[in-house]
Amino acid sequence: MYIAGIMSGTSLDGIDVALVHVEGNGVDSKVELIHFTTVPFCKDIKNEILQALSIDTSNVQLICSLNFKLGLCFANAVEEVCKKADLSLEQLDLIGSHGQTIYHQPKQEGNSISSTLQIGEPAVIAYETNTTVISNFRTMDMAAGGQGAPLVPYSEVILYRHQTKNRLLQNIGGIGNVTVVPSHLSDKSVIAFDTGPGNMVIDDVCQRLFQLPYDQNGRIAKQGVVVDEILTYCMNHPFLKMNPPKSTGREQFGEEFVSELLKRFEKHGKENLLTTVTMFTASSIVHHYKEFILPYYEIDEVILGGGGSYNRTLVEMIRNGLKEEKCAIFIQEDIGYSSEAKEAIAFAILANETHHRNPSNVPSATGAKQSVVLGNITFPPIR
């Protein structure tokens, strides 16, 4: 089957679309990446997403309209990746769309129950591409008592399991998340959870202080020094003290967190602030390994993915934090994969599993009461 996986993450870099060919289903599936592209958001759409993400600027009319606008954007992105791969839409069998997360509340707070909302209307995607769309992957896991995240562990088992090596798969997107993929698999041996901010805080600080979308290759962070006072403040965040399974997002590490950070510590200088929040991402990752993984698993390899794996300063900080551990550290490209395409590929794989009615959440990672089939299916019109 030819499947397009669509991912629009918390970092708002754009729309990632992976066109893959999948043979079979289940953990023995064979997955081949045919083509990958990122379609940047136009300025107006990105601004509307940012407005929708903020409780202060969001409203129901905005979210309602944006839901359909993003559906059209996602459909156009699918058409673009197929065109670049010289594949007609008629040859495309399935689309897996994660959608754009507007709000994610993994646990009950007061009168608000655990819930999540991703937008990007699947009916629009299905109509425009004339292809079946599977979307809303997180909701069934949450209905089953899970946190709806992380969902990539199932795909990581398919793509990265090794006969003799225990591996850690660390994604560094807007949020960081880790998956333990042991050489001998069982339902309870695969664990996964969010490790805290990935690029989210780094990018926000970079945009506010340097008017740049991100710190390319970690060049600016390399120029500063880590301020212990700031790092201690960040590492005392309550999320880092929670036991897995757990998930997080902009609700905890978004605009409000960064605004408070800059208000408290702006006197320390721009470069030092960026260096320190880069170290915060690295330290939060290392902290979670040493606290929740390394005491229980003998890890052979750590494989870094996501946009953060291109930040050389961040990667070096992670290496230094793990230098006493007996594990090799790679990025996706070192082993023949793509850091950028990883999550889009994951949702193509999850779509394939849903198409075959296979459960694809990992309860030991999300906290769900049971394994469930993920997603809603939207069929195109008969033409």
Curated annotation (Swiss-Prot):
Name assigned to this protein: Anhydro-N-acetylmuramic acid kinase
A biological-process GO annotation: amino sugar metabolic process
Organism in which the protein naturally occurs: Bacillus mycoides (strain KBAB4)
An MF annotation (GO) of this entry: kinase activity
Keyword Repeat: no
SUPFAM superfamilies: Actin-like ATPase domain
Pathway field: Amino-sugar metabolism; 1,6-anhydro-N-acetylmuramate degradation; Cell wall biogenesis; peptidoglycan recycling
Annotated function: Catalyzes the specific phosphorylation of 1,6-anhydro-N-acetylmuramic acid (anhMurNAc) with the simultaneous cleavage of the 1,6-anhydro ring, generating MurNAc-6-P. Is required for the utilization of anhMurNAc either imported from the medium or derived from its own cell wall murein, and thus plays a role in cell wall recycling.
Family as reported in the entry's similarity comment: Belongs to the anhydro-N-acetylmuramic acid kinase family.
Keyword field contains ATP-binding: yes
Keywords: ATP-binding, Carbohydrate metabolism, Kinase, Nucleotide-binding, Transferase
Principal EC category: transferase
Record-listed ATP binding positions: G9, T10, S11, L12, D13, G14, I15, D16
Top-level lineage group: Bacteria
